[in-house]
């Protein structure tokens, strides 16, 4: 039986991140390439305490399926925290819980990118973002960076002279992979 995959599957290549993470599974390897936090720094006691509080307060509701946007009390808490810290006016309907950056990047590509669109990105940039966006048939133009981020003169030139730019992907804090 021949499977008839979607055309966009031809854009998807093996993940560089997946290959890097395979190496990190070896016991004698300390990898600085995979973006993995040091396991000894995980706040196990704090997470256990929070789990106990959530289960005591929410019971089985905390373990049940919920809407695709995520657990409503958590979304409400995040909105209130953002409003208090940033002076914004979010409510829970402005918050979407993802299962990590990859799901967020994939959803962004799905919502914003069409085949043939151009994405501007920092050089270097997060490899997994390129993989996520590439699945939607876009191409990339790299913008060189300095200690302050994208070089604005190059960015302005590219914006003035390039068609079909749909998205600028930038990491404004703790840039990956440069830190």
Task: Give residue spans per PLM region.
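N-terminal "arm"/small-domain region of PLP-dependent enzymes with the aminotransferase-like
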Residues: 2-66, 80
């Amino acid at each position: 039986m021949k499977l008839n995959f979607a055309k966009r599957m031809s854009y998807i290549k093996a993940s560089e991140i997946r290959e890097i993470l395979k190496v990190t599974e070896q016991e004698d390897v300390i990898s600085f390439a995979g973006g993995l936090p040091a396991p000894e720094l995980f706040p196990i006691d704090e997470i256990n305490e929070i789990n106990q509080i959530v289960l005591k307060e929410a019971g089985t509701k905390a373990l049940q399926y919920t809407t695709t946007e995520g657990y409503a009390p958590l979304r409400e808490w995040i909105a209130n925290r953002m409003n208090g810290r940033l002076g914004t006016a979010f409510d829970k309907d402005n918050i979407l819980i993802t299962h990590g950056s990859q799901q967020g990047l994939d959803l962004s590509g799905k919502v914003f990118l069409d085949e043939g669109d151009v994405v501007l990105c920092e050089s270097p940039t997060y490899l997994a973002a390129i993989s996520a966006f590439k699945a939607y048939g876009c191409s990339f133009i790299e913008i060189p960076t300095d200690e302050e981020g994208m070089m604005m003169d190059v960015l302005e030139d590219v914006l003035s002279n390039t068609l079909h730019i749909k998205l600028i992907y930038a990491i404004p804090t703790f840039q990956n992979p440069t830190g």
